[in-house]
Every structure is written in C-alpha cells, then in structure tokens.
Amino acid sequence: MRTIVLFMLALPVAAQAPVDEAKALKEHLLANYTKFEYAIPMRDGVKLFTVVYTPKDTSKTYPFLMTRTPYGVGPYGVDAMPLRQLPSPAFWKAGYIFVHQDVRGRMKSEGQFLHARPHNPSKKAAADIDESSDTFDSLDWLVKHVPGHNGKAGMVGISYPGFYTACGMIDAHPALKAVSPQAPLIDYLDGDDCRHNGAFLLAHNFRFFGMFPKLNPKMYASKDSRDPDYGTPDGYKFFLDLGPLSNADQKYLKKAEPFWQDQMDHGDYDDFCKARDLRPHIKNIQPAVLTVGGWYDAEDLAGTFYCYERVKATSPQCPQNVIVMGPWVHGGWARGDGDALGPVKFNAKTADYYREKVELPFFEHHLKGVATDPLPKAALMFETGTNRWRRFDT
C-alpha cells in the first residue's frame, strides 16, 4: 500500500534540546535573567505584546536581540521561563537582552493581523503602518525604556519570523545593526510557502491554514492537538478522497482562515499577490545581513536566495551581506547537530558548526565589537557529496 506522510508546513522552528539540556537552560535563565512583559505602543496607538529577558548582571551593557513572530512568545507570565527559544542556548550564555514579540493582531497583541502584510513605502500618517514601522516603533520604545543596553540591536527569525526580520531591515531603526533572515518568506505567493512557481502547495497550505487560526496563548498550557481527526495517516488517500478543492474549506477549514479563500480568489499573480512580494522594497539596507537557508528546504528555499540577491543588488553600502547554505531541511540548522539527513551522512556536525562558528560570531561582532574569524565576503556553502564547507568572496 502506498503511504505518504500526511502534511508538511512551515511551522515555528526552535532548537529541540534534549530534556536534560532544556532543564539546564531553564535553570540558567532563572539564575541569570529577569523576564518582563510590556505592551509597546505603535504610532497608530495599537499595542504589541512584548517579552524582554534582561541579564541580572548589571555590571555591563548588552545589545538587544529581537524575534517577532505570529506563533506566540509563550509561556506567558513573568515567572514562566521558556524551555526553548531562538536562537541557540549559546546566546543566552553570551549575554543579550532578548526581545520576543507577538506581531500585530496575534496572540496577546492588539490590532488586525494580515498574512505577509504588504509593505507601505509611502507612509504619511500615523495610520500608515506595516511590519517595518512596527519594528521601528518597537525598537525606538525599547532603547528609551529598557535600561542596561549598549545602543545596538539585532534581529533573527526563521520562516515566518524570518519574514518579519527581513521587513525590519527595511527603513531600519538606527539602533538595528545586524539581522539574520533565515528561510524567510519573501514572495509568499510565488516561490515561498503558498505557491512554488505558481503551483499551489495543497498539503502545506491545508494543514498550515487549518492550524494557524487555532493558535492562542492558552495552547501553551494545553496538550490539545492543533489538528482535527483526518481519519487516515495516508496523505495520498486523504486528498484523493477529499474531492473538489472547495471541500477543504467546507469540511475542515470552515472559513476560519480568510487567507485560504484569498488564495482561491487570486490564482493568478495579480496585484493582490504582487503587493506581498517584499523584493521591490529590499533596498538601501543599512544593517549587516546574514541570510541562512537549507538545500533541502521544502518551504522557503526561494526566499533565502531572493533576500540575499536583493541586498546584493540594491545595497552596496550594507556593511556585510553573506548567505549561508547547509544540508538542512526547513530550520534544520536550529536543531540537532546536522550530521545527517535521514540515512544520508555528511560526516560533519554542520548545524553545530553553523551555530557556534557563524551565527553567534556574526552577532557578537556587529553588536558587541568582538573580534571574530571573518566570514567570506559573499557565501558559505556546504557542498554535499564532498561533504565540506566552501567559502566564496564573490
């Protein structure tokens, strides 16, 4: 019998530490960090729920490291410390002021949520907002109200948070000195996630938009499944029996996710789709940029290259623009050691190497002025087959 794994999608990605490592991390955070929760006002009056983890050691100053996400910044409550968070635990030990924010309209943040909110390059009034302005306003508030910082900030995020990171580097706040968009969705409806070269990714879209509206703060304290009972683990049979595509909404999604219908209504690459292409707005980028992706990413491989190529083409003044590609699935560089993909062995702990020798040194250099081994000027690529890292300066 033919069996296919039922669904794959771009989910929030975090380092999946073993139980003992997660326990040690939680103990480290409790001993060394204080958690604060804020409602940060935006220029239009909407308040965004923001969690800030500040080092207890006040003998020195620290940079901000921010992640903006639609998936929630729980566990909620100032006494609840996370067992896993982006980026790697090495950052917590290095010392940063970590900022995790629910984006506009999600979880505990006010306002209206829009998928891949279009960028507004002509803001004239307080009501003219986008993800770039929300990032700017958040950082502006943080540098004015959170003590103990060194005046510099970075951003990092994978997948959807990678999109928000890419938005944040556009018209960036002066404090934002380094960003790392990782597997960022750059053109949501042509290349990333929803459609690949125009083809609708049914399995990915179906489960993602079935799960996404259900996410809420209470789920962090619940073991309830995000998925309905599909009746079978066999994806091929499920979609074969589903019948017309309209049945997906009628039987399962039940109109809980308007963006599903938006995709049905905009099958061509029309103005609705073009407005969600971030590429035309990636220009004059001021922060240093470390774009990261995996060769085996089924969701946002295109966005990784879109991001790097646009910065290269439009921002010669950018202090650093490097792309890193490894033998990883979507977000695979953030979890595990990266020594293998299924039965295929790479004879190298590629993810460990990336986190320890690339990601952390990038932010340490740009946000703290730490002298680190220089990255190549253009690209760091893992070559499968020969199983070695290759450096490119052009």
Task: Please give the residue ranges for each predicted region.
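Accessory cap/linker subdomain of secreted extracellular hydrolases
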Residues: 81-84, 93, 115-118, 125-128, ...
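Short beta-strand immediately N-terminal to the catalytic nucleophile in serine-hydrolase-like folds
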Residues: 155-157, 182, 292
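Short glycine-enriched nucleophile-adjacent loop
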Residues: 143, 162-173
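A short loop-to-beta-strand scaffold at the N-terminal edge of the catalytic core in hydrolase folds
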Residues: 43-56
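Cap/lid segment of the alpha/beta-hydrolase catalytic domain
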Residues: 58-145, 194, 200, 335-346
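Sec-dependent N-terminal signal peptides
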Residues: 3-13
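Alpha/beta-hydrolase-fold serine-hydrolase catalytic core, especially in secreted/extracellular enzymes
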Residues: 17-46, 174, 258-274, 278, ...
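Alpha/beta-hydrolase fold nucleophile elbow
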Residues: 147-159
